[in-house]
A protein has these predicted regions:
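Heptad-repeat alpha-helical coiled-coil signal-transmission segments
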Residues: 207, 214-217, 221-228
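Hydrophobic alpha-helix/TM-entry signal in multi-pass membrane transporters
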Residues: 6-9, 36, 40
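Hydrophobic transmembrane alpha-helical segments in integral membrane proteins
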Residues: 1-19
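Juxtamembrane segments at transmembrane-helix boundaries
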Residues: 18-38, 46-192, 196-213
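Alpha-helical protein-protein interaction elements
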Residues: 3, 32, 154, 220-221
Length: 232
């Protein structure tokens, strides 16, 4: 897969993100009816729209394929973070993620039109996603709840792995000067792995998020049954 060109990987990532969004939306509407599933599904849908625009780069204006697309990615990841907070029983209010999203949009505007710089854009988007995914990992991993601990570590570990990679990508691109300002023309293992690991994260979330809710629901049923037996 490391030999695939960026555009091909972009289309594959678009497909995996769309499948994740569709799956979570279906579960949210038809099965789960759980409070955390709504932001999970919304976040996956918003991020999926971003990957669609990225895959269409060159066919749509830069305002859509660069600025809007990458802002949607950050907004989608931020919305999923709210879902993770709700799942853990925390308040969903986290203003910092929206300040980060707005700052990312402004920096993308600057490095797209005022001072075109592909490396700077990659640093901005990678750092923003790394920060939010790291926060998601901490929310899921920093819990005393024993229920479905292995699943929480699986999902939290996937977030953490991707956050670490995106942080490395941000740092690496501080020292990389691309030959072309067209992202789809870039090469190198780091840029390729960004898509490969995103596909992996999509599959991890598609499997792990429903299992998290299923485990918590089963535990709640067990607890309710035990309380009922105590009463009688």
């Amino acid at each position: 897969m490391l030999d695939l060109d960026i555009r091909t990987l972009g289309w594959l990532t678009m497909m995996s993100s769309i499948l994740l969004a569709l799956g979570l939306q279906i579960i949210n509407r038809a099965i789960a009816r759980n409070a955390c599933f709504r932001p999970w599904a919304q976040g996956a849908t918003v991020a999926g729209a971003g990957f669609v625009l990225i895959a269409l780069r060159g066919s749509v204006p830069d305002a859509l394929s660069i600025m809007t697309a990458n802002t949607l990615l950050v907004a989608g990841v931020a919305t999923q973070y709210l879902g993770n907070r709700i799942f853990q029983g925390k308040t969903p209010e986290s203003p910092w993620i929206w300040w980060l999203t707005a700052t990312t949009a402004l920096l993308l505007l600057y490095f797209t039109y005022l001072t075109p710089n592909l490396s700077a854009r990659i640093v901005v988007i990678s750092a923003a996603i790394a920060a939010i995914d790291f926060a998601s990992a901490i929310v899921l991993l920093n819990s005393n709840e024993q229920t479905k601990r292995s699943v929480r570590w699986f999902v939290g570990g996937a977030y953490l792995l991707y956050a670490i990679f995106m942080a490395i990508r941000a740092i690496a691109n501080l020292f990389i000067t691309p030959i072309d300002q067209n992202f789809m023309a870039t090469t190198g293992a780091i840029q390729t792995l960004a898509f490969v690991l995103q596909i992996g994260l999509d599959f991890a979330l598609a499997l792990g998020l429903p299992l998290l809710v299923l485990g918590k629901t089963n535990q709640q049923l067990i607890d309710s049954e035990q309380r009922y037996r105590t009463l009688i």
